[in-house]
């Protein structure tokens, strides 16, 4: 399945190249492309592979921060790096590599799950028994020049499975708690499991978030004020071609399958699922 997905993405990439060539032939500039990468855990044994991915990123795109309001230049290639769940191995294994290359990143924090072994659904392959999320002290010491923090709710709740008042509490209180922890404004929010709807978007706007992130692998930041931003799932274990295609936006065809999976999760998730 992974190889099949990569081959479809390669076809998308080739089609993009043909389209851009035709635009140049007719005197038009290529469209800007930006992708937001969604990482989770970066284990020590994966640091070298992560570093190689960051080398590819700076060669193929210009890094941007998740809070940017920059208008993308026609023909430009851009990438944003994010990490969900605030695993502490990011500190030792990801931040040094990001700092070397001057790549900004956003870490999405689950405010009531700090300093503990993850007990929610494990998406990644790098978690070990002693894996923990960052503590409040570790969050406060993250270099603000390089790292911004966003909310990922209090409990990693699937918000679409909660009643709206409970979901509102997860969204609003996580922002308030995180701001109190680090004494900095929290402007971004990331939906656990990528599950959201229009009502939740309204709650996020009312709570004061300036941008929210999903797991739909679409091209991002087409407008400076874009509120709902998609991301593509990446992992240090990705094959090089696989990562290059994700970086080029080749996986955006996966938007429909991702939405289908989210719909099925909503159908089968128990009420008040965590």
Q: Residues of each region from the PLM?
A:
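A short, conserved beta-to-alpha structural element at the edge of catalytic cores
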Residues: 102-124
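C-terminal active-site subregion of NodB/CE4 polysaccharide deacetylases
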Residues: 1-82, 87-93, 161-274
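A short acidic, helix-capping loop that chelates divalent metal ions and anchors anionic groups
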Residues: 116-119, 157-162
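Histidine-centered catalytic micro-motifs
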Residues: 37, 42, 148-156
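Non-cysteine beta-strand/loop elements that form the S-adenosyl-L-methionine
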Residues: 106-111, 147-152, 214
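Alpha-helical scaffolding within the catalytic cores
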Residues: 17-24, 124-144, 173, 217
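Acidic (Asp/Glu)-rich catalytic clusters
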Residues: 29, 53-62, 96-103, 132-151, ...
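Short, flexible active-site-adjacent loop segments at beta-strand->alpha-helix junctions, enriched
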Residues: 111-114, 153-155, 233
């Amino acid at each position: 399945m992974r190889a099949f997905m990569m081959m479809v993405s390669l076809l998308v990439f080739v089609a993009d190249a043909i389209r851009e060539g035709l635009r140049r032939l007719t005197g038009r500039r290529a469209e800007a492309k930006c992708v937001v990468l969604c990482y989770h855990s970066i284990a020590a044994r994966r640091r070298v592979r992560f570093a190689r991915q960051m080398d590819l990123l700076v060669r193929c795109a210009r890094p941007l921060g998740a809070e940017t309001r920059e208008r993308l230049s026609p023909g430009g290639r851009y990438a944003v790096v994010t990490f969900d769940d605030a695993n502490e191995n990011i500190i030792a294994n990801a931040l040094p590599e990001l700092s070397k290359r001057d790549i900004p990143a956003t870490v999405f924090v689950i405010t009531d799950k700090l300093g503990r072994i993850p007990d929610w659904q494990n998406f990644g392959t790098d978690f070990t028994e002693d894996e923990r999320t960052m503590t409040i002290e570790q969050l406060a010491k993250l270099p603000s020049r390089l790292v911004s923090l966003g909310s990922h709710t209090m409990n990693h709740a699937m918000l679409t499975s909660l009643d709206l008042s409970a979901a509102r509490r997860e969204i609003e209180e996580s922002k308030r708690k995180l701001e109190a922890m680090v004494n900095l404004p929290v402007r971004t929010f990331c939906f656990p499991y990528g599950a959201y709807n229009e009502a939740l978007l309204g709650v996020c706007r009312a709570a004061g978030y300036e941008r929210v992130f999903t797991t739909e692998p679409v091209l991002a930041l087409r407008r400076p004020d874009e509120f709902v931003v998609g991301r593509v799932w990446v992992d240090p274990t990705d094959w090089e071609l696989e990562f290059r295609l994700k970086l080029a936006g080749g996986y955006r065809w996966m938007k429909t399958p991702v939405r289908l999976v989210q719909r099925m999760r909503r159908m089968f998730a128990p009420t008040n699922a965590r």
